[in-house]
C-alpha cells in the first residue's frame, strides 16, 4: 500500500462574479438613507447582481468550466465533485448533477459527491468532505473539486444592500501549495431561527437581523475556543509531555495567525469580529501585557451583555485597528466590491488575499478561516501557504476583472430584482435579460420548458 497523501489542500482556485454591479453610495441616495449608512456603516462599496439570464446552475457551470480551462485540468482526473449552495432551484435534483455535463462527455461519470446545504456554510462542509475523502481509504488517487456559490437577494428594505452574487471553484488534492492544517478545526452548530428560507415561492429569506448578528458573534467566540482547545490537544501529542513552546510575552494568541479570513455578511461585521477574537484572548488571560489599557470592569462583564456592550466593541476594535489593516483587510476586496456571495464568501476572501499579498514559499504563512451559515453551523480552521501561488494569482486576474464590470444605476438594480421575481418558479419561460452584457465564457439561461427543464448557452 502506498503512503497516505500529504499536504492536502487547495491546488487551484477560480472566482466568478457577474458583469454588473451597483454602487452602494448611489444606492444610499436611491433608498433615501443617510450618507455612509451602507458604505461606512456596513463597509460595502459595490454589490454584484444578475438578471433572469443567470441562476445557480449557470453560475456553477461558468465557474467550474473556467477552473478546468484556466488550469488545464483533465476532467478524467476528478474523482469527487461537491457543491455548496443555498440557492435552490429544485427540491430533489442537485446542482452537482448539472455540472456533470462538464465531465460525462469526457467519459468520466465515476465522480462522488452531491450538494451540501446550510445557508452560507455549505461550501465549507463541501471542502471538509473533499479533504476527508482525499485523506480516507475511499480515495482513488484523483483530485476533488468544490464549487460554492449563491445569488444573495433580499426584499426591499434594510437588508437589501447586503446582497451579492458569485461563486468560487477549488481543486483539492495532495501536494498543494495551500495546505489545510491536519486536525485543526473547531465547530459550533446549534438551532437558531436567525435567517432561513421557509417560503419556497420566493427567493427572499426571512431574517431576524439583530439576532443573526448575535448568532454570528457567538459562533466566532465558540469556534475560536474550540479551535484553541483542539490545537492544545494536538500540540500536547506532538510534544509528548515536554514543554517545547517558546512564548513571546508581547504576542497574544491571535498573533499566531498571519492572516484571518471571515465569512463576510458585511465588512463592518468582519472588523468587529476580528476585535472579538482578541476579546476572547483577553478573557482567557486579562493580565497579558497587551491588555494593560483595557478597562478592568470588562473582565467581569456578563457574557450576554458583551454582545451589545459598546466599550467592549470599541476597545478591541481599537486594539486591533493596525493588525486588521495588515491581516484581515487584504482578504476583503471581493466582499466589499461584490457583496455577500453566501457559501463562496470566505473562499473569495482567500482569492482576495492571494491577489493582494506576495507570498514567498520559503516563508510559509498561516491563515485562519471562519465560516458561518445561519440556522446555524460554523467552523474555524487554518491553512498554511507553503508553495508557489503566483500561478493562481495570474489566473485569477482579480483586480482587472473587478474593474472590468459595468456599474449600473440603482433603478436598474431594482428592475433586475423585479425581473427575477417574475422568473421565479416559472415554466414555459424565456428570460428577457440581455446576454450581451455578460462576460465571455459565461453560461446563461435561454429557456425553461413545460417540464421545468432548463437550457443554457455560452456567451462567445
UniProtKB/Swiss-Prot annotation:
Keyword match Repeat: no
Catalytic residues (positions): 86 (proton donor/acceptor), 120 (acyl-thioester intermediate), 263 (proton donor/acceptor)
Keywords: Acyltransferase, Lipid biosynthesis, Lipid metabolism, Steroid biosynthesis, Steroid metabolism, Sterol biosynthesis, Sterol metabolism, Transferase
CDD domains: init_cond_enzymes (cd00827)
Catalysed reactions, semicolon-separated: acetoacetyl-CoA + acetyl-CoA + H2O = (3S)-3-hydroxy-3-methylglutaryl-CoA + CoA + H(+)
Function according to Swiss-Prot or TrEMBL: Hydroxymethylglutaryl-CoA synthase; part of the first module of ergosterol biosynthesis pathway that includes the early steps of the pathway, conserved across all eukaryotes, and which results in the formation of mevalonate from acetyl-coenzyme A (acetyl-CoA). Erg13A and erg13B condense acetyl-CoA with acetoacetyl-CoA to form hydroxymethylglutaryl-CoA (HMG-CoA). The first module starts with the action of the cytosolic acetyl-CoA acetyltransferase erg10B that catalyzes the formation of acetoacetyl-CoA.
Family designation: Belongs to the thiolase-like superfamily. HMG-CoA synthase family.
Protein name (Swiss-Prot/TrEMBL): Hydroxymethylglutaryl-CoA synthase erg13B
Amino acid at each position: 500500500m502506498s503512503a497516505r497523501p500529504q499536504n492536502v489542500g487547495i491546488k487551484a482556485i477560480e472566482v466568478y462574479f457577474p458583469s454588473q454591479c451597483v454602487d452602494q453610495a448611489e444606492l444610499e441616495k436611491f433608498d433615501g438613507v443617510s450618507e455612509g449608512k451602507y458604505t461606512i456603516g456596513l463597509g460595502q462599496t459595490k454589490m454584484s447582481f444578475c438578471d433572469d439570464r443567470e441562476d445557480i446552475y449557470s453560475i456553477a457551470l461558468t465557474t467550474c468550466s473556467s477552473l478546468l480551462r484556466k488550469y488545464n485540468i483533465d476532467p478524467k482526473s476528478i474523482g469527487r465533485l461537491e457543491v455548496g449552495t443555498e440557492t435552490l432551484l429544485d427540491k430533489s435534483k442537485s446542482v452537482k448533477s448539472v455540472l456533470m455535463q462538464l465531465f460525462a462527455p469526457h467519459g468520466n461519470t465515476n465522480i462522488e459527491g452531491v450538494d451540501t446545504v446550510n445557508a452560507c456554510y455549505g461550501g465549507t462542509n463541501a471542502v471538509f468532505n473533499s479533504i476527508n475523502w482525499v485523506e480516507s481509504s475511499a480515495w482513488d488517487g484523483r483530485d476533488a473539486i468544490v464549487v460554492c456559490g449563491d445569488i444573495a437577494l433580499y426584499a426591499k428594505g434594510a437588508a437589501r444592500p447586503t446582497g451579492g452574487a458569485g461563486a468560487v471553484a477549488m481543486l483539492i488534492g495532495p501536494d498543494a501549495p495551500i495546505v489545510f492544517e491536519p486536525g485543526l478545526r473547531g465547530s459550533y452548530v446549534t438551532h437558531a431561527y436567525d435567517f432561513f428560507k421557509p417560503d419556497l415561492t420566493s427567493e427572499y429569506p426571512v431574517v431576524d437581523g439583530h439576532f443573526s448578528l448575535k448568532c454570528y458573534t457567538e459562533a466566532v467566540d465558540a469556534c475560536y475556543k474550540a479551535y484553541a482547545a483542539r490545537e492544545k490537544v494536538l500540540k500536547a501529542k506532538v510534544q509528548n509531555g515536554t514543554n517545547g513552546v517558546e512564548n513571546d510575552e508581547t504576542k497574544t494568541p491571535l498573533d499566531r495567525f498571519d492572516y484571518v479570513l471571515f465569512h463576510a455578511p458585511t465588512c463592518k461585521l468582519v472588523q468587529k469580529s476580528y476585535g472579538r477574537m482578541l476579546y476572547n484572548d483577553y478573557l482567557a488571560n486579562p493580565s497579558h501585557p497587551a491588555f494593560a489599557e483595557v478597562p478592568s470592569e470588562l473582565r467581569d462583564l456578563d457574557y450576554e451583555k458583551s454582545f451589545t456592550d459598546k466599550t467592549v466593541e470599541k476597545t478591541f476594535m481599537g486594539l486591533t485597528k493596525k493588525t486588521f489593516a495588515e491581516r484581515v483587510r487584504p482578504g476583503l476586496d471581493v466582499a466589499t466590491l461584490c457583496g455577500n456571495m453566501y457559501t463562496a464568501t470566505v473562499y473569495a476572501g482567500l482569492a482576495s488575499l492571494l491577489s493582494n499579498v506576495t507570498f514567498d514559499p520559503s516563508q510559509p504563512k498561516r491563515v485562519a478561516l471562519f465560516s458561518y451559515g445561519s440556522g446555524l453551523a460554523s467552523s474555524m480552521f487554518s491553512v498554511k501557504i507553503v508553495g508557489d501561488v503566483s500561478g493562481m494569482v495570474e489566473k485569477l486576474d482579480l483586480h482587472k476583472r473587478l474593474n472590468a464590470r459595468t456599474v449600473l444605476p440603482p433603478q436598474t438594480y431594482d428592475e433586475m430584482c423585479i425581473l427575477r421575481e417574475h422568473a421565479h418558479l416559472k415554466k414555459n419561460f424565456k428570460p428577457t435579460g440581455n446576454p450581451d452584457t455578460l462576460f465571455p465564457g459565461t453560461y446563461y439561461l435561454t429557456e425553461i420548458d413545460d417540464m421545468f427543464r432548463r437550457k443554457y448557452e455560452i456567451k462567445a
